[in-house]
């Protein structure tokens, strides 16, 4: 049950990011001016009939956020009680600390009237929470645990390949930086600073500049760099590890998601930031990030056979085997 619940928590985090994207895309961040209450009501007692206009998006975001927070609390407790690997338990504690901090940042964002720095930090930390819940879902999955507990034999071919590890890490970090730049663009109002696509004011490079144009163009340049990195990473997997389903599947998914992300980015500009398209662009960017993270984690595990992650004790390994038999 733990793997299923962990996967559900990760999926709910993606829903939360989409809900947050809706708030920003509709300009509803201050539709509810108080926090942690909603117009003086306890969050779960606020009448549905009053959820109209921007209040709908902001209050919905709060409801989803509080639900995800509670789910992560349960996940952290479950890991503490049932997970034999100390480093996985620590991931649960870290996810809990991150989501609490995220909630506080969300409150400060409202109470301080959407300061850019806090809003950007709030958006950026959401991605970290998603990465943590996704990692927990991955390492508690039956396939990961079975292989880790029952086989410590590294893949000889993968052991000789250090390139994939390096480019996968670089790609994941680059995607996160790109998302932070995107959050900066959104929260500083630079989303339409360059109103055409794929050109910039009819040129490859803008002929005039201001801070918002610079931020917007940095996001486009970052998108090009990230796309090349993803193509290199996925291409390396498909050429050198085409027999490894654990690597091929996220590599192919990564190519599909980045193509979709470019399309959504273009449509965001061409549609003048239509809020659904804009929000889909936000959540799809998060999916690109965690897919790259999964590929990175699996590439390390494929090469080291679990050696990169602190080894669990023999008793813990036996515990995992017993649980697999009982399941």
Language model feature labels by segment:
Residues 176, 180-226, 231:
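Membrane-interfacial catalytic/cofactor-binding modules of polytopic membrane enzymes
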Residues 24-59, 191-213:
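Extracytosolic (periplasmic/ER-lumenal) interhelical loops and adjacent juxtamembrane/interface segments
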Residues 1-12, 88-95, 160-177, 246-256:
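Interfacial segments of alpha-helical transmembrane regions
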Residues 79-93, 158, 234-254, 320:
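Membrane-interface helix-loop-helix junctions at transmembrane boundaries of multi-pass membrane enzymes
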Residues 135-149, 163, 167, 291-327:
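A juxtamembrane structural motif centered on a specific transmembrane helix
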Residues 49-71, 210-226:
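Individual transmembrane alpha-helix segments
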Residues 2-29, 173-186:
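N-terminal signal-anchor transmembrane alpha helix
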Residues 23-32, 100-123, 185-195, 262-286:
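Interfacial helix-loop-helix junctions of multi-pass membrane proteins
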